[in-house]
Swiss-Prot record:
The lineage of its organism: Bacteria, Pseudomonadati, Pseudomonadota, Gammaproteobacteria, Enterobacterales. Its main location: cytoplasm. Pycsar (pyrimidine cyclase system for antiphage resistance) provides immunity against bacteriophage. The pyrimidine cyclase (PycC) synthesizes cyclic nucleotides in response to infection; these serve as specific second messenger signals. The signal activates the adjacent effector, leading to bacterial cell death and abortive phage infection. A clade E Pycsar system. The pyrimidine cyclase gene of a two-gene Pycsar system, generates cyclic CMP (cCMP) from CTP in response to bacteriophage infection. Has little to no activity on ATP, GTP or UTP. Expression of this and adjacent effector Ec303145PycTM (AC P0DV27) confers resistance to bacteriophage P1, T5, lambda-vir and phi27. This is Cytidylate cyclase. Pfam families: AGS_C, Guanylate_cyc. Has an N-terminal nucleotide cyclase domain and a C-terminal nucleotide sensor domain (AGS-C). Residues 122-231 form the Guanylate cyclase domain. Its cofactor is Mn(2+). CDD domains: CHD. Disulfide bonds: none annotated. A ribonucleoside 5'-triphosphate binds at residue 125. GO terms for biological process: cyclic nucleotide biosynthetic process; defense response to virus; intracellular signal transduction. The gene is pycC. One of its GO terms (cellular component) is cytoplasm.
Length: 463
């Protein structure tokens, strides 16, 4: 399923809004709406007499006078299918509760008194950039609807990945990812993965839906920026700020503040990750991370501070390689005739504590056995006497880097025609989890030394 189909309502509404600009009676200079700096606007206006203050006021008033019935259409349609499909793709059970804003549900008790509590949190900040000139291209109601559709899509994606919307600040959203279950089982990484996957999907929405729609009718340089970081339990304090009636339960942490700074440093339609989060997952610059460039040089640090006593605080920032990472997520995988079911267990036979796994959905502890159950179905008219399944391991991270060639290896399994059932060949291969980080199993199908189905990735986070 494509992103456009996944977020069908958002795609349709963005298309409707963007095309309404064509019918506006006011004629603005097209160069006004390109990606140049805003100071070019005044120059553009000086060259055109048809842009009058009276005309612009009339344009504003026309939108403001819309009927109540018309204004009801400003409420975005929810993409329930997107939430459901995303949760299915990552093996998450249905989420019954409607999303709420404000205090995180696990800290509601702090609203009643002046106590504080500790608890880890993954904080995500997202904001819309480059939208200032939309008000010159569209009516205020369409600008509102345009921004609100983006905000609504972000909220639904956050909800799909078990996040909690804490604040909406104009055209920005602040969300928390955490759960008591992950805290109790020491699987904070799962909340980190949820936040990254959430952000990656919504960047893809901007790239595949919003950006193309708006570019059809105007040269708007619109996008979003996302910053994410992890604060572990002993470094995050939850408490009730304010006075009764004017109060908010929120998280206080260096890492919450850093997430906000990362968002401001992120390039358009990009995700910036903090050092603590990256180290927790075991990611490295060699796999799915890079550095933002500043004056042609890597901009490695979001904080680089030397105190009066000459002690130095340095905190790294990383840019997620969006296209590379999204390509291994369920909706980024290329169509393939190879189908794979992944599971893991405590023993090689798969008898003890067996669990299903979905690409990039959660962490698996070291020492577990992962089973890859691969199938390949012959098409009409095909008949293979034998097929070879190739299982190719590609490891990443500091743990694996200490081994020769990262301990990368291949295993080939040959299946004869008499072993297939109803035209379906099956091969099963098992590997033990050994190295922290994001590791991959690439599976392909070969006949007579010719690849008949290219590699598909099975990507697993190992704790």
């Amino acid at each position: 399923m494509s992103i456009k189909n996944l977020y069908k309502n958002l795609n349709d509404e963005m298309g409707s809004i963007s095309k309404r600009r064509k019918n506006n009676n006011i004629s603005f200079n097209k160069s006004t709406f390109d990606s140049h700096a805003m100071d070019a606007l005044n120059t553009s206006f000086e060259n055109y007499e048809d842009i009058s203050l009276e005309g612009f006021e009339s344009y504003i008033n026309e939108s403001a006078s819309r009927t109540v019935i018309e204004r009801n259409s400003l409420v975005p349609l929810k993409d329930y299918d997107a939430v459901h499909s995303l949760r299915n793709a990552f093996g998450k059970p249905p989420r019954d509760n409607e999303p709420r804003i404000g205090t995180h549900p696990e800290f509601k008790h702090l609203e009643l008194d002046n106590r504080t509590d500790t608890g880890y949190v993954v904080t995500m900040f997202m904001d819309i950039i480059g939208s200032t000139k939309l008000g010159l291209s569209y009516s205020p109601s369409d600008v509102f609807l345009f921004k609100n559709n983006i905000i609504t899509g972000a909220i639904e994606t956050i909800n799909a990945f078990d996040g909690h919307v804490h604040r909406i600040m104009g055209d920005a959203v602040m969300a928390f990812f955490r759960s008591r279950q992950n805290e109790q089982h020491d699987t904070l990484e799962n909340s980190v993965i949820d936040a990254i996957n959430c952000a990656a999907y919504f960047i893809e929405v901007m790239n595949e839906i919003v950006k193309p729609q708006i570019k059809e009718v105007a040269d708007e340089n619109i996008g979003i920026r996302i910053g994410i970081d992890l604060g572990e339990t002993n470094y995050v304090l939850w408490g009730n700020y304010g006075i009764p009636g004017v109060n908010e339960v929120t998280a206080t942490s260096f890492f919450v503040d850093i997430a906000s700074k990362l968002q401001h440093k992120a390039p358009k339609n990009s995700i910036m990750l903090g050092q603590n989060l990256v180290e927790k997952l075991g990611l490295t610059v060699n796999d799915y991370l890079t550095y933002k460039l500043k004056d042609g040089q890597p901009d490695r640090y979001i904080i680089d501070f030397t105190s009066k006593n000459q002690s130095r605080l340095r905190y790294k920032q990383y840019l997620l390689n969006q296209s590379k990472y999204f390509s291994i997520l369920p909706h980024g995988l290329k169509p393939s005739r190879i189908k794979v079911v992944i599971s893991y267990s405590n023993d090689e036979l798969g008898l003890v504590n067996r669990k299903d796994y979905f690409n990039c959905s959660s962490v698996i502890p070291k020492g577990k056995w992962v089973k890859f159950h691969a199938t390949f179905c012959e098409e009409y008219g095909e008949h293979y006497e034998s097929l070879k399944f190739k299982f190719r391991v590609v490891n990443n991270g500091l743990d694996a880097s200490k081994k020769d060639n990262y301990d990368n290896h291949e295993t080939e399994i040959i299946k004869k025609a008499y072993e297939k059932e109803n035209g379906v060949f099956t091969a099963i291969h098992k590997e033990q989890t050994s190295y922290k980080g994001l590791q991959h199993m690439y599976i392909s199908v070969i006949s007579n030394d010719t690849v008949i189905e290219r590699e598909i990735p099975c990507s697993i986070f190992i704790k």
